């Protein structure tokens, strides 16, 4: 089957459409600070997109590479399309932010400039400036003897045009660098926040004494943060990575954000020194550095402007005074975060670290929080003499420094730390505990779609699978041997791993459904669908009559609903208060027919990373996955549907139609089950009843 370029949606534009769906949450009937959250998330996402994706396209363009992607867009045409998209969307961001801040004022929560304050509050700002701001800000002159300074990625500064009152014709240009140690806003009272640049601007003549301020503008820079490491040539990978992190701080400037109405001479001064394209300059009529809005969102006096806090539940067979290993020994257990608590995952490692019967702990770490209880448990286990092997992925983007810290701490405690296989990132999420029971060794496993990170587990939807079945244990053992030793074989028997094996298995299962024609069914939930071979296979299956439902939160390069290609394919995206992160697959004619995976359907996951795909044999666990997919396919509140033109549309409801919010329903389901079973002391019986209640809800 020949696939026309028009049947592929551009990857970068599809990502921008996803971020637009994040921004679109501001149009919904949400508490005001929840809307402010989505603006902060949107801006943070966009920062990373520019640092990596736009930076990469620019490098290709500068290198003279004009190779087109599957959709026949060259690096230059993609850059033009991205800029056009974002310059248009800038106005949408401004409108949402302005409306939200106006509505917050009705709730007695204000963002005020220095000039808008009364005299008492101005004096308080003055005192704060001289006590806390003036000692740490950095005034910078730029002239023949003062070169243009180094500006850190995402740094926030004030650019100024000055003159000596005695010689007003002699213009001076300079900057005030605002260190990150200073909060973005000064909370001058419990309900009033003053942007720091407003206070600094008012005191410019104290910063540059004897000079008159002619004009000023707040600005923010973005640098290329993509980092290439020649692993094959590295004798000490940790040292090479540390050097790479230092070099990344000096990446080329790729975006300038500046206040709207800024003096043209100031813009020219910055852009000429940064060597930045004019179309990569974004002028905003609202505040800059909006990822820092979390400072306001976290105000404890305005929690009524947030969603009610949901407390994740611990369901049977887990519970107080229940051994993790005893529970897993009796049955496989599938948990869904954040509806179910992440605590059993932590307890799995903590109990292993203290259990005298445990002889070995192995696990992978990709993204962990700065104060990780899980890593501390591993350190404790290693310090106590247990055999601890940890695969720390040092190349996890923007977590490199944190992972370096933990790798060194683990090594110092006596753990065996490995950094994976040359040329591949290790993205699989797996932990293994080996326990001496009688005269035999028993292996317990945890396989997951999400990171070992208690912080992200509160806001990311993921699936955890605990099992002690031998067929899984054999494969997890092989997987860890591959990571820590030499192995030319990278194939597993029950689990599938990438590179290669997961993709082969997926293509085989798609082909199996295609062979069943109209009786074939595929349901796949993931973060991104980019791989051209998989997309082609899905088109071919659709042409054979297979019913295909795809739940793709982010990038989707497949174009659904096109006659002769994809009329049997539907694509939807779920965007809500939790970030959909789980990968769940269903193939009707495969046994077993449910899978969870750490891998998205992207070339990088299927060909350039070590990932795991886990078949789910356990009936109760499959029932849980089936209900999750059913709920998400019936969601008409958080869901957007992708049409054949590549546009995402909200689902239109008639007046009689009931609103189905899959995330809210899952909260209610899990809470109902928890409340029904919390007094049942027979944890095994309660676990089976929990599955039945979930399935029948």
From Swiss-Prot:
GO molecular function: ATP binding; metal ion binding; polyphosphate kinase activity
GO CC terms of this entry: polyphosphate kinase complex
Keyword set includes Magnesium: yes
Reaction equations catalysed: [phosphate](n) + ATP = [phosphate](n+1) + ADP
InterPro entries recorded: PP_kinase (IPR003414), PP_kinase_C_1 (IPR041108), PP_kinase_middle (IPR024953), PP_kinase_middle_dom_sf (IPR036830), PPK_C_dom2 (IPR025200), PPK_N_dom (IPR025198), PPK_N_dom_sf (IPR036832)
Cofactor: Mg(2+)
Organism: Campylobacter lari (strain RM2100 / D67 / ATCC BAA-1060)
Protein name: Polyphosphate kinase
């Amino acid at each position: 089957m020949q696939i026309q370029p028009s049947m592929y949606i551009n990857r970068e534009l599809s990502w921008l459409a996803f971020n637009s769906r994040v921004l679109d949450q501001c149009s919904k009937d949400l508490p005001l600070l929840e809307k402010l959250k989505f603006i902060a998330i949107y801006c943070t996402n966009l920062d990373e997109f520019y640092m990596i994706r736009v930076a990469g396209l620019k490098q290709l363009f500068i290198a003279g590479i004009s190779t087109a992607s599957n959709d026949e867009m060259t690096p230059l045409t993609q850059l033009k399309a991205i800029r056009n998209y974002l310059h248009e969307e800038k106005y949408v961001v401004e409108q949402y932010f302005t409306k939200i801040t106006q509505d917050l004022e009705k709730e007695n929560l204000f963002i005020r400039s220095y000039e808008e304050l009364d005299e008492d509050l101005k004096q308080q700002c003055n005192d704060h400036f001289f006590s806390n701001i003036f000692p740490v800000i950095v005034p910078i002159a730029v002239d023949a003897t003062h070169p243009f300074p180094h500006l850190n990625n995402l740094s926030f500064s004030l650019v100024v045009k000055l003159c000596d009152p005695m010689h007003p014709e002699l213009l001076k240009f300079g900057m005030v660098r605002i260190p990150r140690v200073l909060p973005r806003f000064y909370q001058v009272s419990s309900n009033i926040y003053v942007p720091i640049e407003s206070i600094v601007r008012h005191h410019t003549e104290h910063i540059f004494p004897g000079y008159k301020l002619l004009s000023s503008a707040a600005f923010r820079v973005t640098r290329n943060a993509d980092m290439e490491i020649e692993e094959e040539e590295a004798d000490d990978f940790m040292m090479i990575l540390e050097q790479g992190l230092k070099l990344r701080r000096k990446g080329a400037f790729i975006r300038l954000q500046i206040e709207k109405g800024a003096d043209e001479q100031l813009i020219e001064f910055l852009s000429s020194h940064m060597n930045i394209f004019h179309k990569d300059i974004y002028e905003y009529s609202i505040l800059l550095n909006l990822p820092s809005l979390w400072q306001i969102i976290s105000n404890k006096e305005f929690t009524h402007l947030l969603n009610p806090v949901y407390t994740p539940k611990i369901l049977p067979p887990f519970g107080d005074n229940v051994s993790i290993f005893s529970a897993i020994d009796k049955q496989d257990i599938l948990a869904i975060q954040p509806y179910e608590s992440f605590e059993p995952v932590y307890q799995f490692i903590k109990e292993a670290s203290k259990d005298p019967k445990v002889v070995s702990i192995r696990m992978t770490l990709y993204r962990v929080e700065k104060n990780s209880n899980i890593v501390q448990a591993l350190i404790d286990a290693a310090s106590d003499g247990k055999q601890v092997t940890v695969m720390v992925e040092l190349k996890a983007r923007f977590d490199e420094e944190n992972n370096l810290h933990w790798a060194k701490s683990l090594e110092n405690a006596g753990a065996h730390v490995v950094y994976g296989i040359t040329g591949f990132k290790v993205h699989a999420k797996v932990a293994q505990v080996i326990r001496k029971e009688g005269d035999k060794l028993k292996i317990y496993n945890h396989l997951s779609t999400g990171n070992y990170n208690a912080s992200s587990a509160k806001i990311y939807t993921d699936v955890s699978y605990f099992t002690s079945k031998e067929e899984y244990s054999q494969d997890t053992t092989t997987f860890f041997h591959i990571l820590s030793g030499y192995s030319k074989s990278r194939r597993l028997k029950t689990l599938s791993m990438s590179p290669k094996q997961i993709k082969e298995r997926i293509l085989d299962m798609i082909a199996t459904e295609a062979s069943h024609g109209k009786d074939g069914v595929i349901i796949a939930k993931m973060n991104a669908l980019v791989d051209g071979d998989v997309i082609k296979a899905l088109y071919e299956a659709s042409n054979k009559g297979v019913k295909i439902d795809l739940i793709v939160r982010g990038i989707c390069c497949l174009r659904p609903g096109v006659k002769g290609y994809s009329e049997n394919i539907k694509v939807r995206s779920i965007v809500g208060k939790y970030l959909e992160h789980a990968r769940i697959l269903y193939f009707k004619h495969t046994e077993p027919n449910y899978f969870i995976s750490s891998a998205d359907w992207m070339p990088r996951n299927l060909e350039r990373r070590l990932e795991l795909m886990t078949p789910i044999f356990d009936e109760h666990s499959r029932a849980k996955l089936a209900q999750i997919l059913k709920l998400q396919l019936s969601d008409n509140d958080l869901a957007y549907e992708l049409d054949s033109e590549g546009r995402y549309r909200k689902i239109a409801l008639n007046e009689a139609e009931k609103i189905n919010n899959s995330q809210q329903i899952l909260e209610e389901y899990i809470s109902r089950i928890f409340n029904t079973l919390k007094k049942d002391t027979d944890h095994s019986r309660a676990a089976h009843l929990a599955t039945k209640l979930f399935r029948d809800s």
